[in-house]
């Protein structure tokens, strides 16, 4: 069973070719980490995989996916627990995984940068979908937040999920494929 398949994928942004001929297949338990300098196309690759950006060439096939990027995608007026409940029938697993229990009744707009990042990741965790697409998931996280993220990813993979992550920061994903964009 394939959760994500990219075959011969190319991406153009602003008339500039970011990458081409990219092949990647992720099955249950799979992971890939995309690395490269600013502007190399890491975020664009995540957006192509999510179906938010059309590939200039190649094919993209994916299962149901959840995306965490720079957009929080939570109603800032709502308490965190209620905002997460919009995306998941039971947001509790995501809240617990990211250590946000004490903030469940706090309006999203009151969260710090790190807490907002944890909330975005809690949304993905609680989604219950097999494929996680993570764009710079460690940005804004402290050491505890990063450890919680890595533990959540490990649990997701052990349960048969897959992860594609683009990052500048070290992210412990044992056995993950390394994709370097230049």
Predicted regions and their residues:
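Hydrophobic anchor residue at the start of the ABC signature
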Residues: 121, 160
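Conserved ABC ATPase "signature" region
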Residues: 91-103, 122
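A short, proline-enriched helix->beta-strand linker immediately N-terminal to the Walker B motif
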Residues: 126-130
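Catalytic Walker B motif of ABC-type/P-loop ATPase nucleotide-binding domains
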Residues: 132-136
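ABC ATPase nucleotide-binding domain signature region
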Residues: 44-90, 168-171
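Conserved structural motif at the start of ABC-family nucleotide-binding domains
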Residues: 4, 18-21, 141
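The feature captures the beta-strand-to-loop junction immediately N-terminal to the Walker
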Residues: 35-37
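Conserved ABC ATPase signature
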Residues: 107-114
């Amino acid at each position: 069973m394939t959760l994500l398949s990219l075959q011969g994928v190319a991406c153009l942004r602003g008339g500039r070719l970011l990458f081409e001929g990219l092949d990647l297949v992720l099955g249950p338990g799979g992971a890939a980490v995309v690395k490269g300098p600013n502007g190399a196309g890491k975020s664009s690759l995540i957006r192509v995989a999510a179906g938010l950006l059309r590939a200039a060439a190649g094919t993209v096939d994916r299962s149901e996916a959840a995306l965490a990027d720079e957009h929080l995608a939570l109603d800032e007026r709502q308490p965190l627990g209620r905002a997460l409940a919009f995306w998941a029938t039971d947001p509790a697993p995501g809240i617990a995984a990211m250590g946000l229990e004490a903030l469940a009744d706090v309006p999203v707009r009151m969260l710090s940068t790190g807490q907002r990042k944890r909330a975005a990741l809690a949304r993905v965790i609680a989604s219950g979908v097999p494929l996680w697409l993570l764009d710079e998931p460690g940005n804004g996280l402290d050491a505890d937040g990063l450890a919680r993220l890595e533990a959540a990813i490990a649990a997701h993979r052990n349960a048969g999920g897959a992860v594609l992550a683009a990052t500048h920061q070290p992210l412990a994903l044992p056995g993950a494929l390394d994709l370097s964009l230049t």
